[in-house]
């Protein structure tokens, strides 16, 4: 199945989104619409992948290039319409000598368009010997979509847009998905004769099918799952489609042995991996390339972003980003793990603890009310409540190292850079500014002053 070119249409503004950014750059399950469609199209290995841009052209082009540096960017001029977008693309690709064979065309506002559906569409097109093939689907409510008009033998006659359809045409439930395959020669001839005599005053790509009939057979392939070709035009549709899709994702994980108590409030993105017998509690968000191990418990009300949670670990009411949590380690409640943390096994970061670029050894516990940043803590060390590693001197971030088997008293302050050896005990309220050797007790001797008979100002 050789695909000469794939053209992704990403020129529109998407005015119904009421947004300052193009519709194709809105996110769906962790990726932009554009990147999701490019993912699916690229899986077919077209000889050339082109993206047509216009509204905020450079912004969209940059997003496309960040996905694929080799992508061909086509700038659509001010003449509106999908037909004009394809005219611009074909002119640029033909001039570069990059088109000779089947050409796939896809809109970029269908975040669930999948490579399997596209693969079957191209196979059907080739096997049927079509000059053009449109991907269709059947909808209970086809409002807003172009209708597929067939003759009595079932052949595709044309596609009629909603605003141009008469009453009988509006009753048709088979709709255009804005995904097509054309033979390059047929497409070139068909788009040459496009006109803008319609309610929108645009060059419709759909009109090319009528012209294509004269140059070759026109067929239609129905997508087996309407969800894969559902478009998003506004934020209401985005929310509805997101919810439907997320429910499917949760159901898939539940069938694979993961307990999800409330799929309605649990959100799991595509690249997340979850082990068997893990439990995801309500209000949890698993994002990016998060990995959750077997028997781990996540939630309730927890956000994991590109995090790794090993087997048997518990993360409760916390936010964890780009951090690794070792087996049977407990995080939370109300813990904030910023990027770069590495926990050993059987460790703990408890209530109201914030960490950043901290390496926490096996069995080491930071139970509550502490900040640990740019630090290394050895094995089986206990950090008292209210402890701070003062890592920033106004210019540089400095490291704190605390060894294994240490007992750090409450309210300690470590002024980095500073190193503390193994088996060290610090007194409550200590300020540690200098290196402490192993097997040492250190404390700061602060003088206590009592002022007898003291009254607050409002009682004087």
UniProtKB/Swiss-Prot annotation:
SUPFAM superfamilies named in the record: Nucleotide-diphospho-sugar transferases, Trimeric LpxA-like enzymes
Chief site of localization: cytoplasm
Keyword Cytoplasm attached: yes
Cofactor: Mg(2+)
Disulfide bonds: none
Keywords, comma-separated and alphabetical: Acyltransferase, Cell shape, Cell wall biogenesis/degradation, Cytoplasm, Magnesium, Metal-binding, Multifunctional enzyme, Nucleotidyltransferase, Peptidoglycan synthesis, Repeat, Transferase
Positions annotated to bind Mg(2+): 109, 233
Gene Ontology cellular-component annotations: cytoplasm; membrane
NCBIfam families attached to this UniProt entry: glmU, PRK14352.1
Family under the similarity heading: In the N-terminal section; belongs to the N-acetylglucosamine-1-phosphate uridyltransferase family.
Protein role: Catalyzes the last two sequential reactions in the de novo biosynthetic pathway for UDP-N-acetylglucosamine (UDP-GlcNAc). The C-terminal domain catalyzes the transfer of acetyl group from acetyl coenzyme A to glucosamine-1-phosphate (GlcN-1-P) to produce N-acetylglucosamine-1-phosphate (GlcNAc-1-P), which is converted into UDP-GlcNAc by the transfer of uridine 5-monophosphate (from uridine 5-triphosphate), a reaction catalyzed by the N-terminal domain.
The protein's name in its UniProt record: Bifunctional protein GlmU
Species per Swiss-Prot/TrEMBL record: Bifidobacterium longum (strain NCC 2705)
Name of encoding gene: glmU
């Amino acid at each position: 199945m050789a695909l000469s070119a794939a053209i992704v249409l990403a020129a529109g503004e998407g005015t119904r989104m009421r947004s300052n950014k193009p519709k194709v750059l809105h996110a769906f399950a962790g990726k932009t619409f554009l990147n999701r469609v490019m993912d699916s199209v690229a899986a077919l290995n077209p000889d050339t992948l082109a993206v047509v841009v216009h509204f905020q052209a450079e912004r969209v082009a940059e997003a496309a290039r960040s996905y694929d540096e080799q992508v061909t960017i086509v700038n659509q001029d001010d003449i509106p319409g999908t037909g004009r977008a394809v005219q611009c693309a074909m002119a640029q690709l033909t001039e570069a000598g990059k088109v000779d064979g089947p050409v796939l065309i896809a809109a970029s506002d269908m975040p669930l368009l999948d490579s399997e559906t596209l693969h079957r569409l191209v196979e059907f097109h080739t096997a049927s010997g079509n000059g053009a093939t449109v991907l269709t689907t059947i909808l209970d409510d086809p409002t807003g979509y172009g209708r597929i008009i067939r003759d009595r033998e079932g052949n595709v006659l044309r596609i009629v847009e909603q605003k141009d359809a008469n009453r009988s045409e509006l009753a048709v439930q088979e709709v255009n998905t804005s995904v097509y395959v054309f033979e390059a020669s047929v497409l070139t001839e068909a788009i040459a004769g496009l006109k803008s005599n319609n309610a929108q005053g645009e060059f419709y790509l759909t009109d090319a099918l009528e012209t294509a009939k004269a140059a070759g057979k026109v067929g239609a392939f129905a997508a087996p799952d309407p969800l894969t070709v559902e478009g998003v035009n506004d934020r209401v549709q985005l929310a509805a489609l997101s919810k439907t899709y997320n429910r499917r994702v949760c159901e898939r994980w539940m069938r694979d042995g993961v307990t999800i108590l409330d799929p309605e409030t649990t959100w799991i993105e595509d690249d997340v991996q979850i082990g068997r017998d893990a439990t995801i509690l309500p209000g949890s968000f698993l994002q990016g390339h998060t990995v959750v191990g077997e028997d781990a418990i996540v939630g309730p009300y927890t956000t994991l972003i590109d995090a790794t949670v090993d087997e048997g670990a518990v993360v409760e009411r916390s936010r964890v980003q780009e951090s690794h949590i070792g087996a049977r380690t407990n995080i939370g409640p109300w813990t904030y793990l910023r990027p770069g943390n590495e926990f050993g096994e059987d460790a703990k970061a408890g209530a109201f603890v914030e960490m950043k670029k901290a390496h926490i050894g096996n069995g080491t516990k930071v139970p509550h009310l502490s900040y640990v940043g740019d630090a290394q803590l050895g094995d089986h060390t206990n950090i008292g409540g209210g402890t701070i590693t003062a890592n920033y001197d106004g210019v540089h971030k400095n490291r704190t190292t605390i060894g294994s088997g240490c007992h750090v008293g409450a309210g300690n302050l470590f002024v980095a850079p500073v190193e503390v050896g193994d088996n060290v005990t610090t007194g409550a309220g200590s300020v540690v500014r200098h290196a402490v050797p192993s097997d040492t007790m250190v404390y700061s001797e602060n003088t206590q002053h009592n002022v007898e008979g003291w009254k607050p100002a409002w009682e004087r």
